[in-house]
């Protein structure tokens, strides 16, 4: 994998600065690292990791069957490949 060198603290600072512009931020959802890299390449402002989308990717209905371990592991993998801030729901 191609990990980025940007520290999470710098991603937070970048996100706060984007929020301070009062512009509408475009934050599409990513369900895997490849999608996150494409989101960054296209030029979006951040990446959104949704439990519902992740459940769909795993073949589960969106009724709370994904575990905290599933979400945290996938979110970690996604955040490592992009310099964009990652919002996890």
Regions found by a protein language model. Give the residues of each.
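N-terminal glycine-rich anion-binding loops that anchor highly charged ligand groups
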Residues: 37-55
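Alpha-helix-loop-beta-strand connector modules within alpha/beta enzyme cores
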Residues: 10-14, 60-88
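Short, flexible micro-motifs
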Residues: 32, 54-55, 62
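General secondary-structure edge motif
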Residues: 18-20, 51, 58
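Hydrophobic faces of well-ordered beta-strands that scaffold small-molecule active sites
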Residues: 26-32, 47-49, 86-89
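N-terminal amphipathic alpha-helix/helix-capping segment at the start of soluble metabolic enzymes
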Residues: 1-29, 33-42
């Amino acid at each position: 994998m191609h990990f980025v060198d940007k520290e999470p603290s710098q991603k937070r600072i970048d996100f706060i600065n984007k929020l301070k512009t009062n512009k509408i931020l475009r934050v599409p959802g990513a369900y895997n690292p490849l999608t996150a890299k494409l989101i960054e390449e296209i030029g979006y402002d951040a990446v959104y990791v949704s439990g519902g989308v992740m459940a769909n990717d795993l073949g589960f209905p969106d009724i709370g069957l994904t575990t905290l371990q599933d979400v945290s592991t996938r979110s970690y993998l996604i955040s490592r490949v992009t310099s964009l801030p990652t919002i996890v729901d």
